[in-house]
Swiss-Prot record:
Gene Ontology BP terms: urea catabolic process
EC number, as in UniProt: 3.5.1.5
Catalyses which reaction(s): urea + 2 H2O + H(+) = hydrogencarbonate + 2 NH4(+)
Subunit structure: Heterotrimer of UreA (gamma), UreB (beta) and UreC (alpha) subunits. Three heterotrimers associate to form the active enzyme.
Highest taxon listed in the record's lineage: Bacteria
Gene that encodes the chain: ureB
HAMAP family listed in its UniProt record: Urease_beta (MF_01954)
Family: Belongs to the urease beta subunit family.
EC main group: hydrolase
Species for this entry: Rhodopseudomonas palustris (strain TIE-1)
Name of this protein: Urease subunit beta
Length: 101
């Protein structure tokens, strides 16, 4: 073995298998770019992002951990969200939930 060497099996890994998802159209109505990380509670994102927040409650971006989506000013795009797992308890972010979903 060589330090840092990776042994990768053939095939694909499906992220968030079996979890509920929803696709929303999101528009940045602000004058600055907005970037949202993979595990940010999407319901609590920057108010300049316009979308159906009710459908985003308890959801996060359905992307690989540690990645993000950037919304340029005036840009609209469809994003897929996936339900949060675990205890489904939210603290922090913008302080809109602060407890159990």
């Amino acid at each position: 073995m060589i330090p840092g060497e990776l042994f990768i099996e053939d095939g694909e890994i499906e992220l968030n298998a079996g979890r509920k998802t929803v696709t929303l159209t999101v528009s940045n109505t602000g004058d600055r770019p907005i970037q949202v990380g993979s595990h940010y509670h999407f319901f609590e994102t920057n108010p300049a992002l316009k979308f159906d927040r009710g459908k985003a409650r308890g959801m996060r971006l359905d992307i690989a951990a540690g990645t993000a989506v950037r919304f340029e000013p005036g840009q609209s795009r469809d994003v897929q969200l996936v339900e949060l797992a675990g205890k489904r308890t939210i603290y922090g972010f913008r302080g809109d939930v602060m407890g159990k979903l």
